[in-house]
Amino acid sequence: SGSMGLTFIARASQPSCITFPNHTQNVGSFGDTISIHMNRNSSAFTHTVRYAFGNLSGTCIDAETGKAATAVTTGFRWTIPASFMELLPTVTSGSGTIYVDTYNGSTFVGTKYCGFTATVPASVKPSASIQVLDNTGINDIYGNLVKGLSKLYVKTTGTQAYKSPIKSYAVNANGVRYTAAEIVTGVLTKAGTTTVSATVTDGRGRTSAAASASFTVLDYTTPTVTKLSVMRCNEDGSANKRGGYCKVTFSAVITSLNSKNTAIYYLRYKKTTATDYTQVTMS
């Protein structure tokens, strides 16, 4: 019987992101900081840790030191770059690879890898803004929008989140839903406060928070003649059943519109046998 020493065979370290090496592992979200374990076969080994994601590659940056992940012994922490999401404009998750180059002193031992999968956080979504204008010029005249007269021009702008394109628009205005970036409403149908809101949805299917704006809409009704009487009279307006003049008395109501509305009254008359009316302005 006897004994003999066995030669140490250096084998590259097998990295893991969570527990099991050599499998793609769901590590959380882009922007999260994860632990990468070297699982080294010798305490003499050091490592350089690299990443590959889509067409991007490079040396990982240690989240604790801010330096490149070289001379790593047992493990380190890495923040998955949020910029990776720019390569995922139409999906909400993506996979990459962690490569670990193992060294024994200055001697290169080999490279092994593990995969990882990260998701786009729910907080990553587009944003929306809106511009709302009076499309009729009514607001400039009366200081407010006016029911039955004003129309709104609404322009919705969507801002991409990590290069995910804006795919659709949803605008709610005047009780109607629109699906275009620029719209003009029909005439406003309700008085009081009207609110315009809009959202955008991107290529990942993420919908923005609503952008909204509220406006006061003045009530408006068409002018109404509430009283009208006609009598024969003299030139001075005194009653005379045989007079050669006609005295017209009337009352009418118009909507104030911030005391900026005015009225012009017209009287039309004709002989019974005539076809056309004659119109005069009344004061």
Q: What are these language model-derived features?
A:
Residues 9-18, 117-128, 216-225:
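Extracellular interdomain linker/stem segments of modular secreted and single-pass surface proteins
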Residues 22-32, 134-151, 232-245:
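Short, solvent-exposed loop/linker segments at the N-terminal edge
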Residues 37-44, 148-163, 249-259:
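Acidic, Ser/Thr
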Residues 66-72, 174-182, 279-283:
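Short beta-strand segments within Ig-like beta-sandwich modules, predominantly Fibronectin type-III
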Residues 80-97, 108, 184-194, 283:
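Surface-exposed, short loops/turns at beta-strand junctions within beta-sandwich domains
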Residues 98-100, 198:
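Hydrophobic/tyrosine-rich beta-strand signature of extracellular beta-sandwich/beta-rich modules
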Residues 103-108, 201-206:
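Short, solvent-exposed loop/turn segments at the edges of extracellular beta-sandwich modules
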